[in-house]
Amino acid sequence: MPADKRVSSIDLLRGVVMVIMALDHVRDFFHADAFHHAPDDLDHVSAATFLTRWITHYCAPVFVFLAGTSAWFVHRRRTTTQLSSFLVKRGIWLVFVEAVIISFLWTFNPTLPAIFLGVIWAIGISMIALAGLVHLPARGILLFGLVLVLGHNALDDLHPAGLWWGILHEQVFRMVDGRLIGFIYPLIPWIGVMALGYVFGGLYAPERDPAQRRRLLRLLGMASIALFLVLRLTDVYGDPRPWEPGRGPAFAFLSVLNATKYPPSLHYLLMTLGPAFLFLSVAEARPGPWARRLIVFGRVPFFYYVMHLVVIHAFAILAVVLLGRPWTDMVLDTFVIREPHLQDYGFSLPVVYGVWVAVVVLLYPACRWFAQLKRERTDWWWLSYL
C-alpha cells in the first residue's frame, strides 16, 4: 500500500457518519419536539425521535477515532517530529475554527458573546495531546488510551469545584470575561479515543495481511458489543445513567440504548465503536456507486462539517420566511433549541428527514469539487488543514 494511498473503507465509514451527523443537526433546527424535550428523554419523546437521535451517536466517536487513524497515516510519510508539529498546528487551527467560525454558524449572530466548543474543539485538543503521545512506543499510546476510555467512569462521582474539571470531565457552561463559553465535549475520554484510533491505524500497515485484518476487525467489533451488553445489562460499571427495566420491553430496549454521551461513557463508546469495527471488516470490497458517493464525503470531512452548518442554517432561515416569520428569527441569542421565540416553531419528523436528504444532496457537488481540488493541488500545503 503506497504511503499516499487512501483506504476506501475508512473514507466510506467516515462518509457514512458525516451524512448521519447532518440528520442530528437538521433535527436541531427543524423538529418541533427539539424545542421542548431532549431527544433522549424517554418519558416525553417518541421512539422514532429517540432513534433519530440515537443513530447519530455513531458520529462523534467514529469521527474522533478515525482522526487518530488519519494521524497514523500521516506518520507514514513524515517523521515523528514533523507529525507532532503538524498535529499541534492543526489542533490549534481546529480550536480557533470551533470558537470563531463554527460558533457563528450555529447562531448567525456576530455580536453574540458566546462560544460553543463541541466535537471540533475536542478533536483539536485531542490532536495537541496526541502530538506528545506519538513520541511514545505504540504500546504506551495504547495503554494510555485504554486507561482513559476504560477508566474515566471511575471519576463519575467526583465533582470538584472549578472550571478545569468541567472542561476535562463534565459538560459545563460558564461566563468567562463576560462571554458565555459552553464546554460541550469534556476532554478526557475523547483524548483516549483519538489515542486508540492512532494505534488502530497499525492494522492498515502494508505488511498486514488483509484477511487477518478483517478477522481482527470482526473480533474487535463482536468483543466490544458483547462487553457493552454485559456491562449495560448488569450496570456494574461504565455509565452513570442505568437502564430502566420494569416499564415494558420497548421502553427497556430503548433505555439500554440510552447511554451517556457527555462525557461519552464506556457503554456509549463500546456501543458505537463496536459496530464501526464490524462495518470496516466488511467494507473492503470494491465500492459500488452509492458507496463511492459516500466516500466523497469521507475524504473532505472538515469541509463538509463547515458547509453542512451553513446550508442547514440557511434552510432554517428559508423555513421561517415561508412560515411568515421574520428571517431574523434564525439570528440566535443562544443555542437554537433553547431560543425562547422559537418555542412555537418546528416541523414533524418526516419533514426533518426530507430536509436532511436535501442538505446532503446539495452538499455532494461541492464536496466532490473540493475532493478533486485536494487531489490535484498537492502543492497547496494549506489544503492539508482543511
PLM-predicted stretches and their roles:
Residues 1-386:
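Alpha-helical transmembrane segments and their immediate juxtamembrane cytosolic regions
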